[in-house]
Amino acid sequence: VIATEARAKYNAQQRAGDHDIYKGLTFWAPNVNLFRDPRWGRGMETYGEDPYLTERMGVAVVKGLQGDDPKYFKTHACAKHYAVHSGPEWNRHEFDVTVTPRDLWQTYLPAFEALVKKGNVQEVMCAYNRYQGKPCCSSDKLLIDILRNSWGYENIILSDCGAINDFWQRDERTPRHETHPDAESASADAVLNGTDLECGNSYKALIKALKEGKISENDLDVSLRRLLKGRFELGMFDPDERVPYAQIPYNVVESPEHVAQALKMAHKSMVLLKNKNNTLPLSKTIRKIAVVGPNAADSTMLWANYNGFPTHTVTILEGIRNKVPDTEVIYELGCNHAADFVIQDLGNHITSPAGQGFASEFYNNTEFKGEAVYKGLASQLHYTTGGNTQFAPNVNLTNFTARFTGEFEAPETEQVEIKLSGNDAFRLFIGCLLYTSDAADDLI
């Protein structure tokens, strides 16, 4: 489903002449690192700490992304982050991994080997950290001895974003490896050890490295051939009529079949650990339910990270209200995501005729003209289009306006702080007072 929709979007964007970033056919997934440290904030991308489960899931994802056509790949999958990279995040740009050979071969490498040999993965991303003193993106042991020579991998290796900069840049705020004197030495070493493509800007120095004799044109041609081969096998240089995936129409994106499949996957991927007093499924006879927590009414938080952008997200709060429409459902933030103090959110004291929250009105123009195309109840005002996400049904992705109206009754007499930020112009009315902002990312 993901690869099909990716191809559909790519086809439409190519025909529109849109070649911008994030609109290609390379997916930097799956993440087959092992989630061994709960402090690692990106652990939700992985399949846990079991090497066998990670291998099986990873191979399935690769095959699904890359398709089964005998000549062309649907998209490119990418095994990351190679290797021995499982957090913590804060020192990844300087960390030198120490791991026993047994742990390396039995724990950290099996999933990568399986993706290469069983999944035929087309890209591998080398990690930020060092291994045995060398940055992973210039490690002859990891990239040449194991990946290319032992496993027979002949496809693209690319760096994690900014990883080559860690070789040579000096930064007091962010300690780095500092294993190389300059960008040209770092870039040449990375290419010579198999890193064909950089996410970053250090490879600009390859021209100088070539002139200084640190690398040859023949060395560069090795990587160039791999990169061009990858593009040819995606069908980028062939007429659309010869590439079966180029025929996928845009209307498959979020089609009823795909939405049903996504819902099925969500159902089957959940595990109910406890159901005290048979609380679930929720009974429609319950008179009052309190929903507490910062993620309950936050659609963007539910997307996680490095995610696609759905046209609509059902928050936990919305889902509960939809399940028990006749039950009084109150919401409380409860706590912050991360802070050394607690902010008491008074948003649950904002009401409108429709209930707790703001009455919302959306117009498909920039002047509030005509009738609203959507009217509803907004429990929270944390919105982002993300390029594809509608604020409400039937509302344009761009060039629309919205009005949110509510009445705030303070629970007690005290000083209240109201914060509002946005990346476009907005106006805030408090009673008869007007506060305006015309600047991007402004805060009042």
Q: Which functions belong to the PLM regions below?
A:
Residues 408-410, 414-429:
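Aromatic-lined ligand-binding clefts that engage carbohydrates, nucleic acids, or primary amines
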Residues 435-440:
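Conserved small/polar residues in nucleotide/adenosyl-binding loops
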Residues 1-403, 407-409:
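Glycoside hydrolase catalytic-domain context in secreted enzymes
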